[in-house]
Amino acid sequence: STGSTGKQIRALGFKCIDISKITKTKEMFSGRVKTLNHHLYSSLLYKRDNKEHKKQFLKLNIPDIDIVVVNLYPFEEYYNNNTNKNLLEMIDIGGPSLIRAASKNYKYITAIVKIEDYKKLIQNLEKNNGKTDIMFRKKMAYKVYNHTSKYDKIISKWLNEK
């Protein structure tokens, strides 16, 4: 995890891995580059039932990622409040990329983008012995693409206003 997301996950009593342990790098450019890394995306995008993918993945010596939880930068909130904050810095790049990659691979990975789904995630994990079921993962993938679509639409609207 990065930043506040990890704190929220730990507050719920769950463990999470600091993103730098997977990326094997530190944040760069004042936090603009945190998660854009081939190690991380390898864990998110490889097909776990594909022997060649698995072989390539094992050579990377990084953990499987089963759950991705991302809270996107609050661009809409700052936009709606006419804040003086530089809105360009509130455009999340890594977050949408992470959840979209995880959702593309929903057969194996759960992506969570809404805080109100944290409890649903916990319930699904408890119901399925520490795993999530395919229907839950697919529903969460739908939410990801719906959420990122709205997020991009607001950014596009703002850019068109200038």
Please provide the spans of the model-predicted regions.
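Glycine-rich nucleotide/cofactor/substrate-binding loop typically near the N-terminus or early
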Residues: 4-75
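Internal alpha/beta core interface subdomains
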Residues: 62-162
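Short, polar loop motifs at secondary-structure junctions
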Residues: 2-5, 96
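Short hydrophobic alpha-helical runs that function as membrane-insertion/retention elements
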Residues: 1, 17-18, 110-112
